[in-house]
Amino acid sequence: MKHTRQDLNIMQGWSLEKKIKVSQMKILEWYREYNGQVFTSFSGGKDSTVLLDLARQVCPDIPAVYVDTGLEYPELRDFVKTKDNVIWLRPRYPFTQILEKYGYPIISKEVSDVINGARKGQPYRLARLNGELLDKNGKKSIYNCENYKYLLDAPFKISARCCYHMKKAPLNKFERQSGRHPITGVLACESKLREQSWIKFGCNGFECQRPLSQPLAFWLEEDILRYLKMTGIPYAPISVSYTHLRAHE
């Protein structure tokens, strides 16, 4: 179901109580569509911790899947070990080998992808990097990222492929082998790409090439923090700054 940015703004303004109800409704809808053959993507971070708690309130048998890249903070790994029914995955290749072959992820996945494509002469990514991309109204696109043009001359390879091989590839393989469909804790407010994904597919992307549920997409970070404070559920302290939590007392 396609939405608008205005729809997202309205939903982001809902009360936390309403957001909880709608998110759990979306989780149940996803669970029933695939006869329970689903899983939550669990990193040990605050967003996926809230997602797992919401999901297991309505569907207690949902497994969580954690990709152990070897790069996480020990505190996060220790926290993941406290949860029941968690499936641990590992990437096929070590981090150093992936960096050597594909390059470093710089600033963000989105920026790394633009730099990599621009270096290959791809017109769309060059336009974004030069600040020349226009939207459908002929105005300067919000997807321009000319502030990072200097990275074109960086003396090392830059790529977003690192994230794919370290996290996405193990999850994709698990999906194919298990037949389960993912529920993720991403928030639309975290990036333009995630916002566009929600606008195009909504919370439950049944029609995606890779079906994906993102029932927290319309939440804000302050909602996540309020939920942790309100419920008192355990979380990894390293994933939440002391300043942020005090602000929501």
Roles of regions detected by a PLM:
Residues 234-240:
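Conserved S-adenosyl-L-methionine
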